[in-house]
Amino acid sequence: MEKYLTKMPIKSKANEVPKEEAGVKKETPKVARKATKKDTPKELKDKENAGDDNTPKQTKGRPGRPAAKRKNLDTPDVTEKLAMEEENPPKRRSSRLTRSTRSMAEDGSPSPEKEKPEKLPFIKYKGAIKYFTESQDIAASADDVLQWVEKQKDEVVPMAFDMEWPFSFQTGPGKSAVIQICVDEKCCYIYQLTNVKKLPAALVALINHPKVRLHGVNIKNDFRKLARDFPEVTAEPLIEKCVDLGLWCNEVCETGGRWSLERLTNFIAKKAMDKSKKVRMSKWHVIPLDENQLMYAAIDVYIGQVIYRELERREKVKIKNEEEFKEKNGDAAFKAMKALGETFLTKINEVTL
């Protein structure tokens, strides 16, 4: 009976989904929106970079660069070029040590471009220091020195001269406070002028004595200041007969430029000076001077006397060598040698032109 029955299709309800249609997933609205969204310029550039096979992956904020082709180092041309560079390396400027400077550093020798300054021994003064503060004592001491000068047989008696005074950045230089002189390397005289209203006549006569040759570095300005502070002193006669050691050094040694006492001491005496700023800028008008001030003042005139004697010796040697050279070789050869920069501080017997 059942085989004669026909199966009738069963009508589905309106809310039911057929099995075939249920297997197919509908695209979600979110995906649909992404598909229809317009790409930004950055995204378009990323897509272009991603589609290029010869460029690396795009990094944030930097454009992509094409991959460099690797050189084949096995080619004959490249091999020959590398061999030539190994034999004759190219010259390069570098801040690193070169072979020569490196070997010099290992040996401990200084570089020729920048040699280390020579270390000179400091001056040690072991002579007497005679220090006076009162007007009558200064007058008596100056009179003793004056009598000693008159007893000398030499026509010229060199005397180192220097001055000290206080200085303030608010008020400027103070009145001349100290005069120091040296006529013999074994004794220096220091006269403090704080209690002196007028320079003693014996001291004025001493510095103006016709046999006395006052010398120092920048000494002319010292005389001008002394004349401003003490009207009984006239600067011009002292300036006319004094010797500036820096200018004299330029004449004898044929050097140039301006000299300080410290540099002149290094060059002529081969000694170093302890020019302490604390002592140099100290209160020179305060009585009494301490040991550091006394030694500072004494060394200034002591080394001045030493420099004078050495320049005097060199000048005599130079004059003698020049005269002997002229006698043997003539004036033409002498002028030629001077043009070449010869100073004649050392003896030259013969020259071939």
Curated annotation (Swiss-Prot):
Residues 59-70 have a biased composition (Basic residues). Coiled coil: none annotated. Residues 1-119 are annotated as: Disordered. One of its GO terms (biological process) is negative regulation of mitotic recombination. Residues 13-30, 37-50, 71-90 have a biased composition (Basic and acidic residues). GO terms for molecular function: 3'-5' exonuclease activity; double-stranded DNA 3'-5' DNA exonuclease activity; metal ion binding; nucleic acid binding; single-stranded DNA 3'-5' DNA exonuclease activity. The modification Phosphoserine is found at S103, S109, S111. This is 3'-5' exonuclease. It comes from Drosophila melanogaster.
